[in-house]
């Protein structure tokens, strides 16, 4: 996505759903959410990381983490990572299993895209990687919010 005007937002009218930035950095939070959200989708790239690797990642100045709550219960999260070329990647994004199917994913993604554009006036692109291991409707959600496919790759198994 190359402009905030391309966003087609989806709002959650349920006031019990709230999204907040984690102002106090805690690499364990990033690790635990990655493991909890990603377990269902077989996220494995960081599963073997040491605590030191998680600390370096979770405390990196270019990373911002947001958590979603439903009735004060943790429901999901997303991470935004700014690069040196004006891009912001939605590095990780997802809901905990018990919150999937409640219509919250579109609102969570809308928040992620809006916050990515707010990171700096110099942001020129917001992007995300997805794969066939993600939720079956992940790509449809990205496209419904205005994102377009940039490139397809076949991964070796």
Question: What is each model feature region?
Answer:
Residues 38-53:
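Conserved GNAT-fold acetyl-CoA-binding loop/helix
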Residues 92-95, 101-118, 139-144:
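Conserved acetyl-CoA-binding loop-helix of GNAT-fold acetyltransferases
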Residues 1-23:
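Acyl-donor-binding surface of acyltransferase catalytic domains
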Residues 100, 126-138, 155-157:
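Conserved beta-strand-loop-alpha-helix junction that forms the acyl-donor binding cleft
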Residues 67, 73-82, 89-94:
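Conserved beta-strand in the GNAT
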Residues 55-67:
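A short helix-loop-beta-strand connector motif used in the catalytic cores of GNAT acetyltransferases and
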Residues 82-91, 100, 122-124:
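A conserved beta-turn-beta hairpin within the catalytic core of GNAT-like acetyltransferases
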Residues 15-39:
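Short, contiguous, helix-prone interaction/anchoring segments in small proteins
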